[in-house]
Amino acid sequence: MRLAVGLLALASAQAALAFGLNDVAARAKQLAAKPYQAPPDTLPHELRELRYDQYREIRFKSDQAYWRRDKLPFELGFFHEGSYYDQPVKINEVSPAGAREIRFDPRLFDYGPVKLDPKHLRNLGFAGFRIHYPMNTPKYKDEVIVFLGASYFRGIGKGQVYGLSARGLAIDTALNSGEEFPRFTEFWIERPAANAKELTIYALLNSRRATGAYRFVIKPGTDTEVDVKAQLYMRENVSKLGIAPLTSMFFFGENQPASALDFRPEVHDSDGLSMLSGTGEWIWRPLTNPKRLLVSSFSTTNPGGFGLMQRDRAFSSYQEIGDRYELRPSAWVEPVGKWGAGRVELVQIPTPDETNDNVVAYWVPETPPKPQQPFNLEYRLLWQKEGDKKPGLSWVTQTRRSHGWTTKRPDERKPDDTIALVVDFEGPALAKLPPNAPVEPVFTADANGKIESIFGQPNTATGGWRVTVRLKRVDDDKPIELRGYLRSGGTGLSETWSYLLPPG
């Protein structure tokens, strides 16, 4: 009899935990069949008008972390509504007892110097949440990932600090019609077991033209991994659908020094776009802060992956004690299954300072989903530092820009009317070369660039190889596209350096 009762209890628990992606997908499908309804504007004026620095004074009380009293490995903290974050999200806990909403309570927050009318706090919700896990030391639960604002989320691995963000979906980015920002409206978070090393979250996405159901399996570690599975529904056709979008910042760097005197040599969350094409070609595109909008496309079929990377890990490159740019993660998107034909698109937007995210990268399928038809996608998102995805041969470590000169001899150098680009490569393919092995730099430019000279030489300081390209611009109002790689005896030694020299 006891066995029967035990089996019945187990079956009940399993039934309660049977909540999954299909349940959220059914909600998304129902939403897509109805006209979009914008969320009501219910945030009190005094919260909406908070400056961002004032909003940050409202802090969640860490001793009120969800699951802390239960001594579970994961804990939840929450964000208050206010300032930019003017819409609530519904957050549920999924446990053997069923799905239960975690309700907002102002007593969970310390308002510091921010004075608010208590009656305006009665009917609020949470703006988002963060997840904590003992990632760096066993005794302290670090922040691992944050879901806050539209469909944004950002994560970190061991020894990292927050940098770039990911999104659930991007619609019509960089089009004249204007971008549409879908938002996660409801979350379901599975209560973890006492020995859990991963956490599962479900999310419902909604916008004027799209709905979606998402499952995130979060695995904290040296490289924090987020396994993403989603089912999307379009209410109507979209011009451009951005899958697995990443959002970052590039203000200035080694290839584009600061326009004003600054003690920091570089300021960026990412320094390049890395891509593994369906044919196995690795491509590296250094980032820039352009004078006007730049959109670049890299077409392929069944991509191996793409990401916005922070390759430069030297503190000396940034000299920023507070922001620690060298510790900011790279984010690598690795498709699960075949994504078919499409393109990785890179959008770079002018920014006057480091407070604006001005870089976006995402996958655009060649055949967009049709309205009311399910569109399934799955990928792995890695927040990395030392384990950054790189080609097995050799890779670009830096790109520097200068005026050209008339001779290689330092004592006779004179500036000329050319542009010089200096590209350094490092990696095992170069390290294994015999001392006198021939290395050929293969570099080309489009019709707007006239290459005057290409010079390659060993970089004895790094054990790699340096290539200097001197070129002239045909039309100053147009960009120049360049490509280059290293080979020896017809065999490729490096990834492909792909550079866009902006106009002017």
Curated annotation (Swiss-Prot):
Pathway the protein takes part in: Glycan metabolism; osmoregulated periplasmic glucan (OPG) biosynthesis
Keywords carried by this UniProt record: Periplasm, Signal
Pfam families noted in UniProt: MdoG (PF04349)
Protein species of origin: Ralstonia nicotianae (strain ATCC BAA-1114 / GMI1000) (Ralstonia solanacearum)
Keyword set includes Signal: yes
Xref: InterPro entries: Gal_mutarotase_sf_dom, GH-type_carb-bd, Glucan_biosyn_MdoG/MdoD, Glucan_biosyn_MdoG_C, Ig-like_fold, Ig_E-set, MdoG_OpgG
Function text: Involved in the biosynthesis of osmoregulated periplasmic glucans (OPGs).
Gene name of this polypeptide: opgG
Record-stated family: Belongs to the OpgD/OpgG family.
Position of the signal peptide: 1-15
Domain of life (superkingdom): Bacteria
Protein name from the UniProt record: Glucans biosynthesis protein G
GO MF annotations in UniProt: carbohydrate binding; catalytic activity
GO cellular component: outer membrane-bounded periplasmic space
One of the GO biological process terms: beta-glucan biosynthetic process
Subcellular locations according to the entry: Periplasm
